Amino acid sequence: MLASYASDPLKSRGRLYKELPTSYRNEFERDRDRIIHTNAFRRLQYKTQVFINHEGDHYRNRLTHSLEVSTVARSVANTLNLSSDLAETIALAHDLGHTPFGHAGERALNECMKEYNGFSHNAQSLKILTLLEKRYAAYNGVNLTWEVLEGIVKHNGPITDEINEYIAEYNKQNDLELSTYASAEAQIAALADDISYISHDLEDSIGAKIIDFNSLAELKYIDQHVFEIKTKFKNISSSCLIYEVVRKLIHELITDLLWQTKENLNKEKITNIDEIRNLNYQIVDFTEKTNERIKETKKFLHERVYKSNKITAISLKCTKIVQGLFKVYMDDINLLPVNWKMLIDSNETYSKARIIADYIAGMTDRFAIQEYNQLCSLNFNNI
């Protein structure tokens, strides 16, 4: 049974374009299925999490990451008697707006767009789901419920300063109450993302030999897990050891999140969802000690993994590809596919840049590489 402060699909604020309900799925389940059927969701399979897609079959990509986030979000929401369908749906959609090549690609595209109000993957997720996906005759986008769209836009908290242009524009026709917190389910999705990415980036980085177990000693709480597991299993292999460490880490983080969130709910005597939205802090959270550990782990990953020679070298190449494609298309829109070129008023530089950014952001890693080789390479074999 859902808690009184849960997002009840029967009490949804509805969709921008009214639709009749179905008898066999609730509104949030319908949204989950719509997201899974989008082209943008399928493309996540070929978009970078940390390692470029073709570097290895077992490294995570944006799709596997999104699926892992959704399982954590669903488990946490279920335990707290919240809507697991809503938490899962927001988690599945949270990375739809990412560019090819992960954060390196986003930084590169944002730099290209600095004269045109920049680029944000969060705003791009909203744009994909409300405009760019063309699956219905009656409207653009996939017409998701208010609760899902609110959760995607505000899962990291209220938006009050420097509101992204597209978010502000969309908000005029469908008020997402940007100055308040999102539902507890959306907050769960955001922290499920943290749990998944720090755990699995550690795992993938050890698998790629960017870091080793000796370097994990910098993170004392994780080093303690390593010690306990090696003490229990004397002859454990390195590959199995990292799986055990990650499993223990995820369990520890979820347990901590559940405990602190229950404490917050009891302390605030929360009885309805509006009280969650109007609080001056997010109700779903870790303990202070765990928040410090997460901050420490993110710093470790940033310094030892994301800034490593291997990742930096790849990031430089990815930056060159994104910026090269942007310049080529800006110089000659005839190089764009016909359906994209038709959207552009060639006399208006701003709208041209935004449409080109939408096109590049939707590319997979391999398609971006292929396009770059075709359009920017001096190798005549590519022509």
UniProtKB/Swiss-Prot annotation:
Keywords: Hydrolase. GO terms for molecular function: dGTPase activity. It holds the Pfam family HD_assoc. Residues 62-198 form the HD domain. PROSITE patterns: HD. One of its GO terms (biological process) is dGTP catabolic process. Disulfide bonds: none annotated. HAMAP family: dGTPase_type2 (MF_01212). Belongs to the dGTPase family. Type 2 subfamily. This is Deoxyguanosinetriphosphate triphosphohydrolase-like protein. It comes from Rickettsia felis (strain ATCC VR-1525 / URRWXCal2) (Rickettsia azadi).
